């Protein structure tokens, strides 16, 4: 694993970053987008995407400084009409189904322009692995 993040993450100094990883890449024209996570020491994984090497944090509704088992991981990224769309997994320890941290359930998540939408809060375990977006505004799809 390589540290590619050289910026402040989750409000903490850049030397607080332990590692970062990209799980998906999307090229739109000459712009490169990557989705992934940055591991911050004593906080956990912060969901992010990079646009031409500039890091953007994705929304998470939990406080990683207080939540040992929470995570949000984007698995794929796409762009349509300048809207950045990422999908992945979301896990909040306050949503435990029992007293064992390992028995909680991942929920499918969607981020549109950094804003989080949980796709299936009422169903069991779910996950979003890939996103395909088509612009059909000027033609019939």
Model-derived segments and spans:
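Residue-level hotspots at or immediately adjacent to binding/recognition sites across diverse folds
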Residues: 1-141
């Amino acid at each position: 694993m390589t540290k590619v993040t050289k910026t402040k993450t989750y409000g903490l100094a850049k030397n607080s970053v332990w590692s970062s990883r990209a799980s998906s890449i999307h090229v739109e024209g000459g712009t490169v987008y990557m989705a992934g996570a940055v591991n911050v020491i004593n906080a956990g994984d912060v969901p992010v995407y990079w646009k031409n090497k500039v890091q953007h944090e994705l929304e998470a509704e939990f406080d990683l400084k207080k939540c040992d088992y929470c995570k949000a991981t984007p698995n794929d990224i796409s762009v349509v009409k300048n809207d950045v769309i990422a999908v992945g997994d979301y896990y909040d320890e306050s949503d435990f189904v029992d007293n064992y941290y390992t028995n909680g359930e991942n929920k499918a998540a969607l981020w549109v322009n950094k804003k989080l939408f949980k796709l299936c809060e009422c169903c069991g375990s779910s996950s979003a692995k890939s996103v395909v977006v088509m612009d059909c505004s000027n033609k019939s799809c």
